[in-house]
Amino acid sequence: STSIKLWTYPIGGWGNDETVQGLVSSFNAKYPDIKVTVEYLDYTNGDDQVNTAIEGGSAPDLVMEGPERLVANWGAKGVMAPLNDLWTDDAKKDIYASVESACHNEKGDYYEYPLCMTAHCMAVNMTKVKEVGADQYIDTDKHTWSTDGFLKTVDALYKGGYENVAAIYCSGQGGDQGTRAIINNMYGGTFTDAAHTKYTADSAENIKAIQTLHDTKGINFDASIAGGDEITLFRNGTLQMAFCWNIAQQANSDNNDAGLTNDGDEIFPMAFPTASGDPKLCGGIWGFGIFDNGDEAKIKAAKTFIEFIAADPAQVKDSVLASTYFPVRTSVGDIYADNEIMSEYSKFMAYLGDYYQITPGWATARTEWWNMLQRVGSGEDVETAVKTFVDNANAAAAAEA
């Protein structure tokens, strides 16, 4: 028999011992000779615990998190075992391409085998949108709209007496995926190059988007709020759109039934507007990696665990449900068919874009981003502001590469 250690970050129910032990029991019913001990990490101290364990030669066999840790950090440091043999042709066909591309490095070595995902989106107060006759600009089945339709919706709400339609919040990095996504999507810009080596916010498409948002009445650059504050202002009716949204927000029932504002207006989740009709959403991907501790038996046992939990057709649905997120495999189907909100939201998974959070200099880029938005909001020329952003972010990327 073999014993392996799994360390998991709090990814939905994967941070709950009762839930995880249930999954381990299912694994042991099929593989009784592999003993799995689990340790639960948090996001405050987890990275330090893992790094200390790596330095001390006592890293866990398995870890559950996302590509920015498994591929871009520990994978790049050479402490992970490649999982190329798990990535069969069938797996590559079944798993979303945007997820697959995030799980390997530029050499093609896979350091993550994914289980679940989510996508961040935006939301509108559909009651108010209908009130001003702007629902004509929205494809309610696909949850998509054009950039022109978005701007016409903002204009209709503004002229309808809603002075604060939306906010480009920039007091800090909280919720910054929303401001990146609205700016990148409007005219087809990107946040980084495809190879994830440099930041590209100074492209003509991005400059046009930032300038348009700055010049649009009803959209205000607000250096006093971050994403969480924006959500509060959207829920209480101050704002009619939110750029910081996801399934957790859509399902939240703290102040009213899920899907309703505090006053009972309908909250409708939307993909970010595009000129092309092809939205690219930011998101999260979570799965498993294996630390190479030099013990082939443990690596093999850890791979057996991954295959059972994340690839076995009879098991994978329960593994994903435990996460409260969405499957990365198309074959799993709609696991939330009996939950209208979750089922409808699953449409957004097909819109997941490039997972660029694995670009070097990421921490610096995030700080430089909200600083750039603040400078634009206070009147600095957009081209000057984005040049400072890319200069500083790319200097950090070069230093880390």
Model-derived regions, located:
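Extracytoplasmic/periplasmic solute-binding protein
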Residues: 106-115, 120, 146-198, 239
